[in-house]
Amino acid sequence: MSEWLRFLKRDQQLDVYFFAVPRLSLDIMGYWPGKTGDTWPWRSLIHFAILAIGVATELHAGMCFLDRQQITLALETLCPAGTSAVTLLKMFLMLRFRQDLSIMWNRLRGLLFDPNWERPEQRDIRLKHSAMAARINFWPLSAGFFTCTTYNLKPILIAMILYLQNRYEDFVWFTPFNMTMPKVLLNYPFFPLTYIFIAYTGYVTIFMFGGCDGFYFEFCAHLSALFEVLQAEIESMFRPYTDHLELSPVQLYILEQKMRSVIIRHNAIIDLTRFFRDRYTIITLAHFVSAAMVIGFSMVNLLTLGNNGLGAMLYVAYTVAALSQLLVYCYGGTLVAESSTGLCRAMFSCPWQLFKPKQRRLVQLLILRSQRPVSMAVPFFSPSLATFAAILQTSGSIIALVKSFQ
């Protein structure tokens, strides 16, 4: 276990932090794209089938509760069902774009570990972003794991409390998540196996969104690192000529070639960002919609079960997990946007006036292109910390408004 969680320690090698959480989560589920992405492990299809059964039975149970006008039970059922349904969509798209994800990961790794860009400050930038991404990614995974474990332990804890209070007449076993199951599976001797199966569907959801969302944030963090590495490269290019008033033809030629190399790499990073954003468009859009629904359902659950300590704890855990997932997407988008515009400021602060008019066009080209931030926006949503703050503000306002009517 300690070997798996080495990325939480300080002073580890870069390869320990690099895609640590997504690799761990997706590899367990069989969805890590690997070097080529042209093979589908059997466990990926098995986990897809398990979650598909869980989603279908959970949605059916939620609709049945709605039909009987049991609103509280319906919300308790549909809240995890919505998360699982979106996770099932993520699983399908991860398989659909498995080869593309592998290509993107290899291209990112090739750009990030280019031997021509191995200055100490550039290595520090890569290490800082990798360590930060690993630790932030671990937060939504651990929050989701706690939420799922709370759901799975709830029936056992209630049974223990009833047993200790000698309330045997009220003793009834029920499953962690409300699912429509054949009666034969809810009776002895099959009930323990049914309980384990239903509990496991929750962990499939947790590890899949931890891996899929973690892959998104890790990719954004390393795209940000690439932009910052370019900034460091530009500053190091001009550093020897800070005190010069004029450059020789040889110096101009060398600097021009380096400048062209920076522009080529800048274009490659932007192309990679767009390619990645296109593959994650549906996932990002579905995630924002589902997170909004989960937060809404959870708020209603809190307001209706406010006096129930265990119900309130489930609400808090679910809301923290949903907000953690949103934070991963929003912070990732902010990192990419801010670091891409930082390249413009770094270029402008250098003594670019040493160039001749012909070479200055390269500088103007880079400044013009980097003035517009590289966006991870999808239809209707733009992942950024401003969006995350607006969601928090809206959620708080709705809670305060509903509380005032009680």
Swiss-Prot record:
Glycans are attached at residue 178. The chain crosses the membrane at residues 46-66, 75-95, 144-164, 190-210, 282-302, 309-329, 373-393. The keyword Ribosomal protein does not apply. It is found in: Cell membrane. Residues 1-45, 96-143, 211-281, 330-372 are cytoplasmic. The atypical heteromeric and topological design of the odorant receptors appears to be an insect-specific solution for odor recognition, making the OR/Orco complex an attractive target for the development of highly selective insect repellents to disrupt olfactory-mediated host-seeking behaviors of insect disease vectors. Odor-evoked OR currents are independent of known G-protein-coupled second messenger pathways. Interacts with Orco. Complexes exist early in the endomembrane system in olfactory sensory neurons (OSNs), coupling these complexes to the conserved ciliary trafficking pathway. This is Odorant receptor 10a. It comes from Drosophila melanogaster. The gene is Or10a.
